[in-house]
């Protein structure tokens, strides 16, 4: 399985959680039919605006879907956090 560093995790102005990998592009992720999408312009995976799931649920789901696409995404000390509360950051990093 390929690994890639997560360079940024954030919540955008549309209230979608996004995860930005350093190198890997997930242009065909729509084929998984998992509600995880790829933003080809900004180069990140993203969820829909949460309704029944929390941001933590969506984070875990995106990570699993990426692994199903043969890529393990890894948080590093260089990962940037945008519009993420300290509580959510702590939960994600557990």
Regions found by a protein language model. Give the residues of each.
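Accessory DNA-engaging acidic/polar modules
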Residues: 1-94
């Amino acid at each position: 399985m390929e690994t890639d560093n997560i360079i940024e995790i954030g919540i955008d102005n549309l209230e979608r959680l996004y995860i930005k990998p350093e190198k890997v592009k997930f242009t065909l992720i729509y084929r998984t039919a998992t509600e995880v999408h790829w933003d080809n312009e900004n180069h990140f995976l993203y969820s829909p605006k949460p309704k029944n799931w929390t941001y933590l649920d969506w984070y875990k789901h995106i990570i699993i879907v990426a692994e199903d696409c043969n890529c393990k995404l890894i948080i590093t000390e260089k990962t940037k956090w945008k519009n993420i509360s300290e509580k959510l950051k702590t939960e994600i990093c557990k």
